């Protein structure tokens, strides 16, 4: 049987995600971000709600990406997620992309010339942002051009790099309907951005979300809910360079900007430069919110939920892979658990995220 991996955020889960799961074959394993997202923002609803949405709509097993994999630039995000899925025995990786290319060929190219390609990136001027450097590399070695608004294509290339040299086949699926950042309501498939923006419009949600009741009942948060706490973390920290990935230049810019910024959005605008993209600045602010430090990634994989098919697969992995299904006295990953506690501060009605929580079981599928 084919074992298909999917790397996702489901922020929130919508019909486009359901379409992706429907297109995937065999046993479907999802490696999903926890409560903080790749582009440096809190999830609109918590990880358990999103895992349940996925399991109700075709996923067989949902595992959690640790905080320091979730909140990373595309390459590290892809690498960390593929590592986890590889250990769970996937033989193919399915993903949505705006531009369906021969990603397998691209992965083979990276297998062959990876070292040379990375050297090329290192030698590019520092005035370029990391995404610009990566795009220059793909243009040079694979003749790829970027149309600009294609974040899923950028992630797809990160997955191609991550599977290089592994026995995993890549299966791109053409993205349906609205673009990633689109807030357009008049489409067949709405984007997660649009659903977050129109979260109070029930008709809209019902048109584009398969598990709409779950979403409506869940406690929701946005970045602004954490602004007072973020402000406190910035003002009370004498040296922001002790925080993961924060350099001197960014520390100075953030300290200066917080004096006048009235919101997270304003702070991001003030700190962003040509070299430091908004997504990168949001990630840095997320690290500051968490007081994140460089840390080793957990050995074990945290299971959020499964169907009967997924449970059988986990049984077959016993003894080969370290799995955590209940976080108790023994921590799974201190950094992720701390992030979960801080996530709960954004809305007092968010349920406890770790202690006493057991994987969601979906009986029928």
Swiss-Prot record:
<protein>
    <recommendedName>
        <fullName>tRNA(Met) cytidine acetate ligase</fullName>
        <ecNumber>6.3.4.-</ecNumber>
    </recommendedName>
</protein>
<dbReference type="InterPro" id="IPR014729">
    <property type="entry name" value="Rossmann-like_a/b/a_fold"/>
</dbReference>
<comment type="similarity">
    <text>Belongs to the TmcAL family.</text>
</comment>
<feature type="binding site">
    <location>
        <position position="96"/>
    </location>
    <ligand>
        <name>ATP</name>
    </ligand>
</feature>
<dbReference type="GO" id="GO:0005524">
    <property type="term" value="F:ATP binding"/>
</dbReference>
<dbReference type="GO" id="GO:0016879">
    <property type="term" value="F:ligase activity, forming carbon-nitrogen bonds"/>
</dbReference>
<dbReference type="InterPro" id="IPR008513">
    <property type="entry name" value="tRNA(Met)_cyd_acetate_ligase"/>
</dbReference>
<keyword id="KW-0820">tRNA-binding</keyword>
<keyword id="KW-0819">tRNA processing</keyword>
<dbReference type="Pfam" id="PF05636">
    <property type="entry name" value="HIGH_NTase1"/>
</dbReference>
<keyword id="KW-0436">Ligase</keyword>
<keyword id="KW-0963">Cytoplasm</keyword>
<dbReference type="GO" id="GO:0005737">
    <property type="term" value="C:cytoplasm"/>
</dbReference>
<dbReference type="GO" id="GO:0000049">
    <property type="term" value="F:tRNA binding"/>
</dbReference>
<feature type="binding site">
    <location>
        <begin position="7"/>
        <end position="20"/>
    </location>
    <ligand>
        <name>ATP</name>
    </ligand>
</feature>
<keyword id="KW-0067">ATP-binding</keyword>
<keyword id="KW-0694">RNA-binding</keyword>
<dbReference type="GO" id="GO:0006400">
    <property type="term" value="P:tRNA modification"/>
</dbReference>
<feature type="binding site">
    <location>
        <position position="152"/>
    </location>
    <ligand>
        <name>ATP</name>
    </ligand>
</feature>
<keyword id="KW-0547">Nucleotide-binding</keyword>
<comment type="function">
    <text>Catalyzes the formation of N(4)-acetylcytidine (ac(4)C) at the wobble position of elongator tRNA(Met), using acetate and ATP as substrates. First activates an acetate ion to form acetyladenylate (Ac-AMP) and then transfers the acetyl group to tRNA to form ac(4)C34.</text>
</comment>
<feature type="binding site">
    <location>
        <position position="175"/>
    </location>
    <ligand>
        <name>ATP</name>
    </ligand>
</feature>
């Amino acid at each position: 049987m084919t074992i298909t991996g999917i790397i996702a955020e489901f922020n929130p889960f919508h019909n486009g995600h359901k379409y992706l799961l429907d297109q995937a074959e065999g046993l479907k394993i999802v490696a999903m971000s926890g409560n903080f997202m790749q582009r440096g923002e809190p999830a609109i609803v918590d990880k358990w709600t999103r895992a349940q949405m996925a399991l109700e709509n075709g996923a067989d097993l949902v595992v959690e990406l640790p905080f320091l994999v979730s909140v990373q630039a595309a390459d590290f995000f892809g690498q960390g997620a593929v590592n986890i899925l590889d250990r769970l025995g996937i033989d193919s990786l399915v993903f949505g992309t705006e531009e369906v290319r021969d990603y397998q060929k691209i992965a083979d190219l990276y297998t062959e010339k990876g070292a040379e390609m990375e050297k090329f990136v290192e030698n590019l001027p520092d005035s370029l942002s990391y995404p610009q450097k990566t795009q220059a590399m793909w243009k040079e070695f694979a003749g790829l051009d970027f149309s600009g608004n294609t974040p899923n294509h950028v992630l797809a290339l990160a997955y191609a790099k991550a599977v290089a040299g592994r026995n995993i086949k890549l299966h791109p699926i053409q993205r349906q309907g609205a673009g990633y950042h689109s807030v357009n309501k008049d489409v067949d498939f709405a984007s997660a951005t649009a659903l977050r923006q129109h979260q109070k419009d029930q008709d809209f949600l019902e048109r584009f979300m398969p598990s709409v009741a779950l979403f409506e009942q869940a406690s929701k948060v946005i970045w602004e809910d954490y602004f007072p706490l973020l402000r406190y973390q910035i003002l009370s920290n004498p040296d922001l360079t002790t925080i993961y990935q924060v350099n001197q230049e960014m520390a100075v810019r953030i300290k200066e900007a917080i004096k006048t910024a009235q919101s997270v959005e304003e702070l991001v605008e003030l700190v962003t430069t040509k070299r430091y993209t908004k997504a990168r600045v949001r990630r840095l602010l997320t690290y500051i919110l968490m007081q994140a430090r460089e840390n080793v990634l957990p050995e074990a994989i945290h299971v959020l939920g499964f169907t009967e098919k997924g449970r059988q697969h986990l049984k077959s992995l016993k003894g080969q892979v370290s799995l955590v299904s209940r976080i108790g006295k023994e921590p799974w990953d201190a950094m992720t658990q701390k992030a979960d506690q801080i996530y709960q501060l954004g809305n007092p009605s968010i349920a406890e995220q770790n202690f006493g929580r057991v994987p969601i079981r979906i009986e029928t599928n």
